[in-house]
Amino acid sequence: MLDIVKFAESGQLFDNHYKLLRSLNTDGGTADVWLALDANTVKDRSRLDDAPHLSDDEVQELGLVVAIKIYRPKNALDIEGEQRFRDEYMIVFNCNHTNLLHPTNYSIFDEVPYLVLPYCRQGSSEKLIGKLKKDADIWKYIEDVASGLAYLHACTPPIIHQDIKPGNILIDDIFNYAITDFGISSKKGGKHGYYFDDENSGTLAYMAPERFLESTEPIPQSDIWAFGATLYELLTGNVPFGEDGGYAQAQQSVAMPDVPGVSADIQRLIHACLALNPEDRPTAEQLALSARQKQFPIKSRKPLYISLVVIALLLVGGLSFFLGGNNCWVSRLTSNICRVPIATATRP
């Protein structure tokens, strides 16, 4: 069974490709995340042994620095599980969006699956917990994360993240927010049990009420609830319903918590995301649109041509009155304009 710490200390290349430098300790109970150097990009390979003792800047001068997420040996896969892992991550691998931090490579070493991801030196949004205060910064966060979720949910079939939380939102070098760990749905076939099963996917404090029901298929609305819980924690320093998340909300009929110090629009948005009924929650696309317009809900706006038709009717009506209403062409024009279909503006 692979002991990743001892393996790193041995100085060997992971999968004959990556020099493990140090643990990033950014994951939960299913995997270890390591900073690594892609040995194939290092010109002077004699310096590989020195790499673990160098600063990030010095290592980046040697070659490509990446983050490797190595799933723990208890999640080792049999042959069927390996194929499912490859099939599922081929879908995720092909996702391309600014606000998604997708893997650049994935494989299996010593029966243990691993992912290769871009290294984000700025870390995750966990460091913003209780510190995200300015409305402009909050709207930026909402737009970036909601845009990434909207992309995933629009895939065929939809990709449900199932573990949206501050630690899974990373900050890139130009301070955009990017979702990581997406695409983790139910994958059975583990050699020592199940790998990524529904029971273990997700973090309780961010799990929507419906996630605790038996035989519930993953739905996009559960990601929206988790996003609402994430926003609440970033703004207040606490998760909205305690460590039991949506379970506590459903069992205790807890009142919706206030979000102090933010605009009414942002508070309404968070409350809508945390609605007990999944059907009452906004879509990710609606959240992204709200962030761009900095309001929630989006106010209805009648199309411009409606106003133009009204103006035309008034002008023609005035002209008809001026001419005494006896001109046939005026009557026909008025009649034709009145038959122009006027669409009713709806909320997106």
Task: List where the protein language model places each region.
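AlphaC helix of the eukaryotic protein kinase fold
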Residues: 75-94
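Conserved activation segment of eukaryotic-like protein kinases, specifically the C-terminal portion
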Residues: 195-210
